[in-house]
Amino acid sequence: MKLLIQGNNIAVTESIHDYVESKLEKATKHFQTFATKVDVHLSVANNARITDKHKAEVTVYANGTVIRAQEGSENLYASIDLVSDKIARQLRKYKEKNFGKKTHVQEKTSEVLPEDPVPDNLIGDRAPELPSEVVRMKYFAMPPMTIDEALEQLQLVDHDFYMFLNKDTNAINVIYIRNHGGYGVIQPRLGKE
């Protein structure tokens, strides 16, 4: 398994490198068969107003799946401990879900929500403000998947949303975590309405 450690506003010393390597080796030792690459990004915020100055982000690439975790604290070593525990839990969950014994079939349900029109006064007289320029572009592979598979990926990447190619409709969809609990899916609709 390939391990890449990068630092932002911090020099990655040999002791930090060894500590990260030992913690992640311990966290990923049972998952060596499907984890191919691990990226670690350590950063220190030089801002007095930020309480959790030391942040550790770990991204594990496993069988075409991205599993990501990030933690921050006042101590770099504590952040590394927290993120390694979190990534170990996520890897265990991924392994149990995809490689565990399936003894029973769980019935999957879904609910179709009514399509209510958006009120005209939602934005008011404000004009939406967009950034003046694109500062970063990302490209990634987008294999077709079901909404349930996209939900699983959303939970693994530790983000608020996940964009995917819907296997059923062959359209790009976004699944997101709702503020009031649960998940939502944004699907494109052709036409003006």
Curated annotation (Swiss-Prot):
Chief place where the protein resides: cytoplasm
Pfam family, one: Ribosom_S30AE_C
Record flagged with keyword Cytoplasm: yes
Molecular function (Gene Ontology), one example: ribosomal small subunit binding
Subcellular location: Cytoplasm
Keyword terms: Cytoplasm, Translation regulation
GO cellular component: cytosolic small ribosomal subunit
Induction (record text): Is repressed by light, since the transcript is synthesized in the dark, but upon 20 minutes of illumination, transcript levels fall below detectable limits. This light-repressed transcript is present only in dark-adapted cells. Is rapidly translated at the onset of illumination; in fact, is one of the first proteins to be synthesized upon illumination of dark-adapted cells. Repression of the transcript in the light requires protein synthesis, which suggests that a specific protein is directly involved in lrtA light repression.
GO terms classed as biological process: negative regulation of translational elongation
Knockout consequences: Knockout mutants grown in continuous light appear to be the same as wild-type, showing no differences in growth or photosynthetic activity.
Keyword Cytoplasm: yes
Family: Belongs to the HPF/YfiA ribosome-associated protein family. Long HPF subfamily.
Additional remarks: The transcript for lrtA is more stable in the dark than in the light: a 3-hour half-life is estimated in the dark, whereas a 4-minute half-life is observed in the light.
Subunit-structure text: Interacts with 100S ribosomes.
Function: Might modulate either transcription and/or translation. Required for dimerization of active 70S ribosomes into 100S ribosomes in stationary phase; 100S ribosomes are translationally inactive and sometimes present during exponential growth.
UniProt-recorded name of the protein: Ribosome hibernation promotion factor
Protein's organism: Picosynechococcus sp. (strain ATCC 27264 / PCC 7002 / PR-6) (Agmenellum quadruplicatum)
